[in-house]
UniProtKB/Swiss-Prot annotation:
Keywords for the protein's UniProt record, in alphabetical order: Cytoplasm, Methyltransferase, rRNA processing, S-adenosyl-L-methionine, Transferase
NCBIfam families membership: PRK00103.1-4, tRNA_RlmH_YbeA
UniProt-listed Enzyme Commission number(s): 2.1.1.177
GO MF entry, a single one: rRNA (pseudouridine-N3-)-methyltransferase activity
Organism from which the protein derives: Thioalkalivibrio sulfidiphilus (strain HL-EbGR7)
Described function: Specifically methylates the pseudouridine at position 1915 (m3Psi1915) in 23S rRNA.
Protein family membership: Belongs to the RNA methyltransferase RlmH family.
One Gene Ontology cellular component: cytoplasm
Chemical reaction(s) catalysed: pseudouridine(1915) in 23S rRNA + S-adenosyl-L-methionine = N(3)-methylpseudouridine(1915) in 23S rRNA + S-adenosyl-L-homocysteine + H(+)
Gene3D superfamilies per record: 3.40.1280.10
Protein name: Ribosomal RNA large subunit methyltransferase H
Entry-linked InterPro entries: Alpha/beta_knot_MTases, RlmH-like, tRNA_m1G_MTases_N
PANTHER family: METHYLTRANSFERASE, RIBOSOMAL RNA LARGE SUBUNIT METHYLTRANSFERASE H
Length: 156
């Protein structure tokens, strides 16, 4: 299964790219994590933030590969323990379909993105900077996979 992390924003700080790559590169081909960056719309002083969110949301939806399961990351979504996420990952891997994870920009996800999702997932009730979400997601996917495979990375 390929996991497509579709995220708004390009040109992340070096530490974000390094941390994301650290975990993404640990995953095997059976559960590969690939980043698709969606260019953020420029925000000016009097920017129409609703229009910007709609534009970015439409670009995200266009980037979803055909026949993917779609999981939208949103603070109002469902939260999972590590064990629950590991079971979900196992189900997704056995579905025979790829997975798309949607991470919005500063304005969050649009209603259309949430409606397209098969699941809306909340990493935490806290608000995280969007670049950091990439790192957290990569680490949590790796942790869930390592738990499935009995790898010593995750400890109860």
């Amino acid at each position: 299964m390929r996991i497509h992390l579709i995220a708004v924003g390009e040109r992340m700080p070096a530490w974000v790219n390094a941390a994301y790559a650290e975990y993404a590169n640990r995953l095997p081909a059976e559960c590969s994590l690939n980043l698709k960056e969606i260019p953020a719309v420029k925000r000016g002083k009097n920017a129409d933030l609703a229009r910007i969110a709609e534009t970015e949301g439409a670009r995200m939806l266009e980037a979803i590969p055909k026949d993917c399961l779609v999981v939208a990351l949103d603070e109002k979504g469902r939260s999972f323990s590590t064990a629950e996420l590991s079971r979900r990952l196992d189900d997704w891997m056995h579905s025979g379909r790829d997975l798309a994870l949607l991470v919005g920009g500063p304005e969050g996800l649009t209603d259309a993105c949430r409606a397209r999702a098969d699941l809306v997932w909340s990493l935490s009730p806290l608000t995280f900077p969007h670049p950091l979400v990439r790192v957290i997601l990569a680490e949590q996917v790796y942790r869930a996979w390592s738990l499935l495979r009995g790898h010593p990375y995750h400890r109860e």
